[in-house]
Amino acid sequence: MAGLTATPEAVAGRVASIKDAVTRVGTAASAYADISTKALAPGGSTADTASSQAELVSEIKKLLAEVQGPFRAMFDLFGSLSKVAALRCLAEMGVFAAIPASGEPAAVDEILSRLEVDVDRALLVRLLRITAADGPLVEVGEETYAQTAFSGVMAHPDLVATFKHIVDESGPAITLMPQFFIENGWKQPTDPTNCPYTFAHRTEGSEMWTHIAKFPERQKNSNRAMKAQSFDGVWSVGLFPFAEKIKELGKDTDASTPLVVDIGGGAGHTSAQIRELCKGIEGTVVLQDLSEVIADVSPTEGVVAMAHDFFKEQPVKGVPIYFLRRILHDWADASSVTILRRIADAMDRELPSRLVIAEQILPTRGISSESALVDMLMMTFTGMERTEKQWEELLAQAGLKAVHFYRALGTPFGAVEAVLA
């Protein structure tokens, strides 16, 4: 093809680019090693480590792209789809639990004998090939495989459920997204009953959450995925000074006083952390979620669990802090405004009550690949990640105003503090 013919000049230029990329990887690796060591010391920041790791990963990807060249890089996009499909098949078969987590190798026939489902040997061999070509499994002999640290997580119940949930729910929606827009117009989806997800899954008028609930196994995977997700970025809860803000109010409290309402708080990991951050202040953190979620919550001292649908009237009024973590990115603006208005109606202007939203706050440029990927996944069912300006505009529609944005250097996770406008 014109412009892509290998000439001495082109080869020399490519070699120079590769050497430059190698240098950048070395620099990023050294920085990561240094920051990771400092993070282990008292006062160290995991946010700094996350930022440095993201920079290292970015530079490694750039190096890989330089070495591969455009054709190989494009081919690898298709290879990634094939590998995901193979991994999903192996996860369903139970293969990752059939290969020793210790790293001890297992031959194909051994793996087959440990599976609880009937699997054709030739099929298993072909699926294992692609997962061992460059990971996550490793091929240690003819038709013999062993686990790696990467593949080992696929045997963890919550993590494999998360993987299944993402592949089963988002996979078809991402793949058919172009066709959805071709048929429905090139505009941002805002109707949860007419979006890439509903198009791909043929939900017949149901939005995603209602559709998933029709399938017990998929609902189970979804619940476990939400549980696993509750740990992701949980450190960012500490960005907001809960105790300081509550003490500023000068309000007398006792053991039964609601200090914070954690709305849509899931399994309660965040609620427990907030209560710890408010150590020394009498009162409780109210954990709210749907009844089926609350039913599985383990008791935690200082945390009161309550069944609640955040689209309905907020029953706990006049609390110092209302807290939303990774909720609004699941919803388009119209639905998000409804959620916010329910909270605003319960807030005390004189106190004043505060709303704290822990979410990604996207930069206006230079977004990370991870944040962009999450935003694409959210788009499949009308959700979205938002910039500072978009958060301000969203809050204004609900009669609220942002008064402060809390951020950690090098990470998109932050906290938006808002009061009644």
Name these PLM-found stretches.
Residues A2-T5, V22-A33, A39, E104-A106, ...:
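Conserved adenosyl
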Residues S102-L115:
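Short acidic, hydrophobic short linear motifs in intrinsically disordered regions
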Residues A132-T144:
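A short, conserved structural fragment
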Residues V117-A133:
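Short amphipathic alpha-helical interaction segments
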Residues G366-T382:
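Short, glycine-/aromatic-enriched active-site segment of Class I SAM-dependent methyltransferases
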Residues L64-M93:
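Short alpha-helical segments that sit at the start of domains
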Residues G383-G399:
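Short alpha-helix
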Residues A2-I60, L64-G69:
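Eukaryotic partner-binding/assembly regions in large regulatory complexes
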